[in-house]
A protein has these predicted regions:
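Surface-exposed loop and turn segments in beta-propeller and other repeat-based domains
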Residues: 26-35, 72-90, 128-137
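Hydrophobic core register within WD40 beta-propeller blades
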Residues: 42-44, 98, 144-146
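Blade-level signature of beta-propeller repeat domains, shared across WD40, Kelch, NHL, RCC1
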Residues: 139-173
Length: 173
């Protein structure tokens, strides 16, 4: 994106390289990816240059185009009522995938499902749990993509091993 290459390591170092010579332009510390084998996905907003980094259980970090790092842009929620009641308060969603839409940030947040965030504040606008239907065993939200089709925004979420769900973004009152 923006003629640059972006990488993140498990310790939370985001490196920005010149795409032509692979010279390091900038390095940012956003906090560790937990657990270490978790997906560490980034998205870069082309127009603003803002960088959003998934850190598993540690949520999402935002690096603003001015270099300011918010390592706690979005905090993954802790499950309060899981099926296995002994896990209440101990199991968290994991920020696995991220996509940038025209107005919102979309986070594939593991077993917690899809989370829609305000671009500026990181506050949750809405949430669709992964197991939205009774007897639904779809796994966790792993990857998310967004696409604009004829002026309408669609969000695609890949869950576990058995489905992709498509949402049309609408505004409600």
């Amino acid at each position: 994106a923006n003629s640059k290459l972006y990488t993140v390591d498990v310790d939370g170092n985001v490196n920005v390289y010149n795409n032509n010579e692979l010279e390091t332009l900038d390095t940012y510390k956003v906090g560790a990816v937990v657990p270490k084998d978790n997906k560490a996905v980034m998205a870069v907003e082309e127009t603003s240059g803002d960088i959003y980094v998934c850190k598993g259980e540690n949520g999402v970090a935002k690096i603003s185009s001015n270099g300011q790092v918010n390592d706690n842009f979005f905090t993954c929620p802790t499950f309060t009522k899981p099926e296995k009641t002994e896990l209440a308060g101990k199991v968290k969603g994991r920020a696995n995938g991220i996509a940038i839409g025209s107005e919102y940030i979309y986070v594939a947040c593991g077993g917690y499902g899809l989370v829609v965030l305000d671009k500026e504040t990181g506050k949750t606008v809405c949430h669709r749990k992964a197991n939205a239907y009774k007897n639904d065993d779809c796994g966790s939200a792993n990857y998310v993509a967004v696409e604009n089709v004829n002026g309408e925004e669609y969000v695609y979420v890949a869950y576990g091993q058995n489905r992709v769900q498509v949402f049309k973004v609408t505004k409600t009152k």
